[in-house]
Amino acid sequence: MGVENTKQTMSSQNIKPAKDSDDVLHTQFKEVKRSPMRYTMQLLAALAVSMASLMIGYSSSYTSPALVSMRDNTTATFEVTMDMAMWIGSIMPLSALIGGIIGGPCIEYIGRRNTILSTALPFLAGWLFIALATNVAMILVGRSICGFCVGVASLSLPVYLGESIQPEVRGSLGLLPTVFGNSGILMCFTAGMYLAWRNLALLGACIPIIFLILMFLIPETPRWYISKGKIKEARKSLQWLRGKTADISEELDSIQKMHIESERIATEGALIELFRKNHIKPVFISLGLMFFQQFSGINAVIFYTVQIFKDSGSTVDENLSTIIVGLVNFISTFVAAMIIDRLGRKMLLYISSILMCITLFTFGTFFYVKELMDVTAFGWIPLMSLIVYVIGFSFGFGPIPWLMMGEILPVKIRGTAASVATAFNWSCTFVVTKTYEDLVLHIGPYGTFWLFGTLVAVAFIFVIICVPETRGRSLEEIERRFAGPVRRTSAIANLKPMPITI
């Protein structure tokens, strides 16, 4: 029984395309390697949409430095209680959950690019609400607006990039949003050393302006245009993305055939479609990756970094520690972007879960020993543990769940499934951030980190059993892998489009 399951698992993790159509597609996509310049416009598109991720990172980490100055009685113009502070920290993921739900229909009806673009002005308004706040209610409104935009953007970015970027660079360019997100975290931590919460919010208000300008330079995805019957616009968009001299006829033809086949399949209710035989596995994998991403405890760590270092009694300055953590986060994600298309998604997920598991148990053990004896001489352990933990997260479970959401969800359900996955991710984020301090109160910091470490160990097993390798495969090949073997006569017809990631 165990041997049989192992065989089935191993075979499910190797994407074996049907020779007829997949070999043609694989050859087609490998031909683009002749000229690196063919990726220039795809890089520009990735950079433009990644500015939204910079805002996501800045918004996510804002509470860590801001709450310190908000609760400073010597400078505060109104009181921020402990309970209010918890809501300021947790209202953003709760609002992001709503944004994730609404973002799904938006990317289908108004397009991927327009959905991303529509977050710019609300982001600006949210930060101005916070910066000009005269009471806690205004801060909560501002955080809610920013959180809503975070949910919409985190859903739309993987969709846009998955549909716009070629397979051989999809891993590297697909991780750019995570690199930018970590840049936002680093920017917020660094600025937080010198700026009080109001000025920190004003700095956040500057980012959407740059983002707005860049988004006007890039096109909508060709797959969305084709789904709306706009073939001329799709050709123009694909030509822009692939370069003026690129021959796009074969790729455009394959996308059209995928769309025709998806339209041919009988349509049921959107949510019912999620449970079709060839849809349920990619949806389950995407939800599983989102669950383990958040229950690794990353957002509890990011939201409460300063507080964690204070509680640990570390001899290292907590503000300096947050900057070091943010810098390591940025560098390690950048390295991951450079190697993901060489090592593959699964290898980075293995490395990620092992590093996080070891460091979470180390961190928990430090807090446990701290209650029994003086650990002043070991004050460097929290910082080192957190650094290695962040490296592990940034290598795998940080960026890859969002990247794979844009790769494995079938075109037929991509908008709906991406919406469900994003809402689920932010639901988990809300649960983790809202219950973190309660967990610390009831089972202690050591119990909390041991719990996160145990869940990461389960994540390692989940990757082994369930997650397929998608490196170097076109979206069409990945979708057919989940659909199962096809007859020779329908190999080309079974190509399906690809509309869609935190």
UniProtKB/Swiss-Prot annotation:
Task: Supply the alphabetized keyword list.
Answer: Cell membrane, Glycoprotein, Membrane, Sugar transport, Transmembrane, Transmembrane helix, Transport
Extracellular topological domain ranges are: 60-83, 142-144, 194-199, 304-319, 368-376, 434-446
Q: How does it sit in the membrane?
A: Multi-pass membrane protein
Give the Gene3D superfamilies listed for this entry: MFS general substrate transporter like domains
Give the highest taxon in the source lineage: Eukaryota
Output the CDD domains linked to this UniProt entry.
MFS_GLUT6_8_Class3_like
Recorded hits in InterPro entries, A to Z, give:
MFS_dom, MFS_ERD6/Tret1-like, MFS_sugar_transport-like, MFS_trans_sf, MFS_Trehalose_Transporter, Sugar/inositol_transpt, Sugar_transporter_CS
Q: Name one GO cellular component term.
A: plasma membrane
BP GO annotations: trehalose transport
Q: Which Pfam families does this chain map to?
A: Sugar_tr
Read off the SUPFAM superfamilies from this record: MFS general substrate transporter
Signal peptide range: none
TM annotation in the entry: 39-59, 84-104, 121-141, 145-165, 173-193, 200-220, 283-303, 320-340, 347-367, 377-397, 411-433, 447-467
Family note: Belongs to the major facilitator superfamily. Sugar transporter (TC 2.A.1.1) family. Trehalose transporter subfamily.
Q: What is this protein called?
A: Facilitated trehalose transporter Tret1
Q: What is the lineage of its organism?
A: Eukaryota, Metazoa, Ecdysozoa, Arthropoda, Hexapoda
